[in-house]
Amino acid sequence: MPDLTPFWISIRVAFVSTVIVFILGIALARIMYYRKSKWTHLIESIVLLPIVLPPTVLGFLLLMFFSVDHPVGHLLTDILGIKVVFTWVGAVVASVIVSFPLMYQHTVQGFRNINPRMMNTARTMGASERKIFFKITLPLSKRAIISGTMLAFARAIGEFGATLMIAGYIPGKTNTLPLEIYFLVQQGREHQAWLWVLVLVSFAISIIGTMNMMNQERYREVD
């Protein structure tokens, strides 16, 4: 019977990071959609940076940012007692950083695909911006938000480079599935690594299949 600890650590890290990304992604998408300014493109470029930056670069930046020598790391570790580096919290932080752009991108695109005349009509009828957002914008962007959430969760499950840099490989604490596969191969235990490889491949196929089914349903509705 294989040790399921890496599986449950990955699920916990991915779940917590996805909840955070879900909330922050929708919040930022709403701000960027409703409050366009000259800074919009710059902010979006910064948000999307984790997509193109190497994971090791992200991990290095996070390691420096949360180290005790940095003001933020000092505040969290020495004053608030929250240790990020080489803990599962660090794995969550890494997963949030790498998966956030996917959630944001899908959500804001879902908002932009809505016909603005629907919201303008609601405004002329006296609906508040808050009511428009919760009654029109969110429901009509449901598929985009679900797709973004699924991709964010999948990205968090598969995160390796940044997690290795900031959380390290600590059995029973930070050994997520990608890290476990890497170190099993390093130890010459490829037959054990195959189990987790098949788990991740099956998970990825199920995510992609579900998203394709959702897209097909959307196209049928349009037709």
What are these regions (language model features)?
Residues M1-V19, R35-S37, G81, V185-E190:
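Periplasmic/extracellular loop-to-transmembrane helix junction in inner-membrane transport proteins
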